[in-house]
Amino acid sequence: MSKKLGFALSGLMLAMVAGTASADMDGGQLNISGLVVDNTCETRVDGGNKDGLILLQTATVGEIDAGVLNDTVGAKAKPFSITVDCSKANPNPGSTAKMTFGSVFFGNSKGTLNNDMSINNPSDGVNIALHNIDGSTIKQVQINNPGDVYTKALDATTKSAVYDFKASYVRAVADQTATAGYVKTNTAYTITYQ
């Protein structure tokens, strides 16, 4: 290689390094989450797919008037169900399904789900509560609490079970009013069998 070409390439490399070092830089983070399962049985949210979208009705700030309560749903409660169907499972996973809930990004110590404050114009001071509805019994789901297990026997004939829940708005702090804005959060449910 000639010395002229070597000097030209060296100069180009210095220009690239110098240009990169002096440039302004912007960036951000990507939150990536997922779930890997062995698909022992099929699950469906509201009769659809295993992943569901629960759309709550619009609530006024005044309607979100309390923090989370163990045996009472919050504002604009939306019912939804999760069906576990083991009729096609081979081998049979057992006769009982046990469900828990967790959230990598939005769980908190009250067992509710924080609002995603990274969205445009988020509501501040509001959480989402999930409650299990078992007949006339209402019980708050404790997100990220592995001891908060919802157990159902699989029907002997259909090999299935249906869990009923409600999602609702609650105050993040009981004595602080929520602000107007959008609400978005997520949770994952996990089912084990015995």
UniProtKB/Swiss-Prot annotation:
Pfam families listed in its UniProt record: Fimbrial
The effect of disrupting this gene, in the record's words, is:
Deletion of the operon under classical laboratory conditions does not result in any major effect on E.coli capacity to form biofilms compared with the wild-type strain.
What the record says about the induction of its expression is: Repressed by H-NS.
Please list the disulfide bridges: 41-86
Which UniProt keywords are listed? Disulfide bond, Fimbrium, Signal
Q: Single Gene Ontology BP term?
A: cell adhesion involved in single-species biofilm formation
Entry's InterPro entries? Adhesion_dom_fimbrial (IPR000259), Adhesion_dom_fimbrial_sf (IPR036937), Adhesion_dom_sf (IPR008966), Bact_Fimbrial_Adh_Pro (IPR050263)
**Primary site of residence:** other
Record has Cytoplasm as a keyword: no
Q: Where is the signal peptide?
A: 1-23
Q: Where in the cell is it found?
A: Fimbrium
Q: Which GO terms describe its cellular component?
A: pilus
Q: Which family does it belong to?
A: Belongs to the fimbrial protein family.
Reported function: Part of the yadCKLM-htrE-yadVN fimbrial operon. Could contribute to adhesion to various surfaces in specific environmental niches.
Q: What else is known?
A: The operon is cryptic under classical laboratory conditions, but is functional when constitutively expressed.
**Name this protein carries in UniProt:** Uncharacterized fimbrial-like protein YadN
Tell me the name of the encoding gene. Answer: yadN
